[in-house]
Amino acid sequence: MIQVLLVTICLAAFPYQGSSIILESGNVNDYEIVYPRKVTALPKGAVQPKYEDTMQYELKVNGEPVVLHLEKNKGLFSKDYSETHYSPDGRKITTNPPVEDHCYYHGRIQNDADSTASISACNGLKGHFKLQGEMYLIEPLKLSDSEAHAVFKYEHIEKEDEDPKMCGVTETNWESYEPIKKASPLVVTTYQRYVELVVVADHRMVTKYNGNLIIIRTWVYEIFNTINEIYQRMNIHVALVGLEIWSNGDKIIVQSSADVTLDLFGTWGEIDLLKRKSHDNAQLLTPTDFDGPTIGLAYVGTMCDPKRSTGVVQDFSPINLLVAVTMAHEIGHNLGMNHDENYCSCGGFACIMSPVISPQPSKLFSYCSYIHYWTYINYRNPQCILNKPLRTDIVSTPVSGNELLEAGEECDCDSPGNPCCDAATCKLRPGAQCAEGLCCEQCRFMKEGTVCRIARGDDMDDYCNGISAGCPRNPFHA
């Protein structure tokens, strides 16, 4: 029998209109103190894991009760995820820390179809969620009452620097970039792609965070949890395969010129990093103040290139959402996306590929970005992001039509009664196209255009593509 255990925490909210408080995210002049209440459904007598696969919290926002549903992001890390740092004498130290039982979640607000959430539950709730079209941040308060949290809007954070923050990419930035020419009708791709990414934190990051590698690691995880969520909408699985921290000094000369730094980082990645850590893309994270308003730079349309599948990103804000959006932007350039024009829209807010960081940050790509990405996939066809990860590569939650298989398997051997799968060989039976999935019926792919997932709220239906068992996400989702 399932019993619902209510973790009894006072469900109260005390708005501090017009007051100011110093938080990790900065000085906030309008916020609420809330006490989230966790609701856990466990079998009677079951031992509660440290970090459950799914969690639910009740709290008040603007005095109104909301329910936050969270699900552990099991696609965040690759199973061979590794971390590298350096001893004072320069020795390379590489470890494979256990990451399966991590504390990073994605989620939504109950009864709000347009809501999203990216939350760290490591020490209280820290992150951001979208509610009724507005972005809110949440973080624990460092008070004697450890359950108190602050909830506030991004615009209520006092800005020390009002200068615009921009990406440094221009159409003529790189001689090696040839604009993609339309040679035939564009084919909209619904196949999932997989980007295996390494983040490199330079020595200034070590100095900025007082040599605390754990803090740097946590910061990168928070950023990457949001990046992973952002790209899910494009049916791209971005997984963190490695983190390298230049703890004893930089391996390149990190300069204020973003162009020079990007070139040096790409060269180092090709001759050093790639030879010891397989990956599709690498991003350098640095507090270095680049020249002018630039906070990031990347090559355009270079995913899988040994040197140029790279970007550099300034760690310019204590708000992980802003740094995550910037890194997602630079990865977007690597995936063939150009900057949004004025007519490219995301429901009234600036989109991911806007050349300027918006006062109202968005986690959405514009339709223009989808067109750029599909065009790039059609005419450049980067091969490294086509391979479907195996369980030896990616830790991910199995979902209908998208099971992750062991090496050599075509279907899940754990289902001996499946008429489409030979349980002895883990191969599809003769004549079978598939064994399971929302678009698999009687061992055959369902016809293209068959609805496989009904829309919820203002969302859009998802359709089978006729060539796979999975139910691909509709590329026109908001």
Swiss-Prot record:
UniProt domain Disintegrin: residue ranges: 397-478
Motif (Cell attachment site): 456-458
Keywords: Calcium, Cell adhesion impairing toxin, Disulfide bond, Hemostasis impairing toxin, Hydrolase, Metal-binding, Metalloprotease, Platelet aggregation inhibiting toxin, Protease, Secreted, Signal, Toxin, Zinc, Zymogen
Similarity section: Belongs to the venom metalloproteinase (M12B) family. P-II subfamily. P-IIa sub-subfamily.
Residues annotated for Ca(2+) binding in this entry: 196, 280, 384, 387
One GO term describing the cellular component: plasma membrane
Enzyme kind, highest EC tier: hydrolase
EC number: 3.4.24.-
Catalytic residues (UniProt): 330
GO MF annotation terms: metal ion binding; metalloendopeptidase activity; toxin activity
A GO biological-process term: proteolysis
UniProt binding sites for Zn(2+): 329, 333, 339
Signal peptide start and end residues: 1-20
Cofactor(s) essential for the protein: Zn(2+)
Highest classification ranks of the organism: Eukaryota, Metazoa, Chordata, Craniata, Vertebrata
Assembly and oligomerization: Monomer.
Disulfide bonds: 304-384, 344-368, 346-351, 411-426, 413-421, 420-443, 434-440, 439-464, 452-471
UniProt protein name: Zinc metalloproteinase/disintegrin ussurin
Propeptide, chain numbering: 21-190, 390-413
Ranges where the Peptidase M12B domain occurs: 193-389
Pfam families: Disintegrin (PF00200), Pep_M12B_propep (PF01562), Reprolysin (PF01421)
Organism: Gloydius ussuriensis
